[in-house]
């Protein structure tokens, strides 16, 4: 994360360090190094060791995110199965994660390499807009996917009323809303002349606010829109989902107990007839709860990855005792950079909960296909040999003794299982 310091004073200036509200838009290695070491008379220097660490982390995140999400999209494209609503949401969440990689991580990686933003004013505004757009898209796509799981579990009859159309409308709304909410970046960020250590002036892509409290308002709004509000919605949806599943399972259990005791009555709770909202507990457990678990893991990963970043952002603008050199701590810097690790985790979560996606992904590559075929052939040969050996050992002709004279043995031989 970048916390440019230098001559910036929140009490005396309305210009803000490049607050992108994206973990990658941060070079915590900037001006403070020159202030601490005084090795460069121009003052526009940075902590090179920390900068190298940032560049390495961003490069790894970019490569892993691109490979993982591209593999998921390729597997979804090649899968012979009929595309479900969950696959539709996974596809668009992978696209949102690719947007994070290309619009957020990659520009910041280039920015860290060049130290200062190298480009015209319009490019500065576009980059800042796309960085925040990717953040909104990733968060809101997760919200609509969780909302779809809530509808599927708590209101199953609604899934019969044009479910594909509703899902596409929800996805389109999340993309459009993300684009609109990130549009103010065009008016907040621009190429301006900033003063660094020792009075040196340079051009960089920074945010400018009319009022001194603008930075606090901006960071608080972005934290609420990208993190707090989505987390509240996600928590509410999962609260209803868990309550509904618990009530359904309890009703089914009470119904089975009543049937076992010979009572032909449905269970009552507080004078009301308790009837399960879904036809079968097994159906919930195997189909819907698996996708609910997958979405829950994705939500948990999102919170764990992004919470440290937003905590540091809020701390830096609301704590009057905060100094920019605090962000020179490598642990703070890397913790903030790891926010985009969420885009790397999601593909593996999809593949873990949808085993066929991993198989379809592997089959997309010829080299992996040959390896799978070789292992499958070896396993098939080994299984055939084991089956033949097992059958021969169980055959009466290979047995000793008077098995024909023993009716008990003769009857038992008929029921000896032979694996197929």
UniProtKB/Swiss-Prot annotation:
Extracellular compartment segments: 1-54, 114-125, 190-225, 316-331
One GO-annotated biological process of the protein: cellular response to hormone stimulus
Gene: Avpr1a
Function: Receptor for arginine vasopressin. The activity of this receptor is mediated by G proteins which activate a phosphatidyl-inositol-calcium second messenger system. Involved in social memory formation.
Disulfide bonds: 124-205
Compositional bias per record (Polar residues), positions renumbered to this chain: 385-403
Transmembrane portions of the chain: 55-75, 93-113, 126-146, 169-189, 226-246, 295-315, 332-352
Species the sequence originates in: Microtus montanus (Montane vole)
Protein's name in the database: Vasopressin V1a receptor
Stretches with biased composition (Basic and acidic residues): 32-45
Membrane topology: Multi-pass membrane protein
InterPro entries listed in its UniProt record: GPCR_Rhodpsn (IPR000276), GPCR_Rhodpsn_7TM (IPR017452), V1R_C (IPR015076), Vasoprsn_rcpt (IPR001817), Vprs_V1A_rcpt (IPR001224)
